[in-house]
């Protein structure tokens, strides 16, 4: 019997930037287009559903999407706590540095640059 060893090469992807516990929850999805994992989320005032954070108001992001969505899902899973790598988060293109820095103010989420 011949055994062949295969060495897997993986890219090191670090999404966490601290040792805070990262807890998840599920919520109603208001997302209607394909959305990558690690996208900041906010509550839609009209529907009460979780949608992609628009980057307009600091402190209004309440979660980070755990898994990518196709846009047809009625529910989603999101991180409700933890410290994430700033570089790993899929930020809105229009967000400025001040709003990004304080996106999760008042929540159990935070972010920091990786060393």
From Swiss-Prot:
GO terms for cellular component: viral capsid, decoration. InterPro entries: Head_decoration_D, Head_decoration_D_sf. Pfam families: HDPD. Keywords: Capsid decoration protein, Capsid protein, Late protein, Virion. It is found in: Virion. The keyword Lipid biosynthesis does not apply. Its main location: virion. Belongs to the lambda phage gpD family. Stabilizes the head shell following the rearrangement of the gp7 subunits of the head shell lattice that accompanies expansion of the head. This is Head decoration protein. It comes from Enterobacteria phage P21. The lineage of its organism: Viruses, Duplodnaviria, Heunggongvirae, Uroviricota, Caudoviricetes.
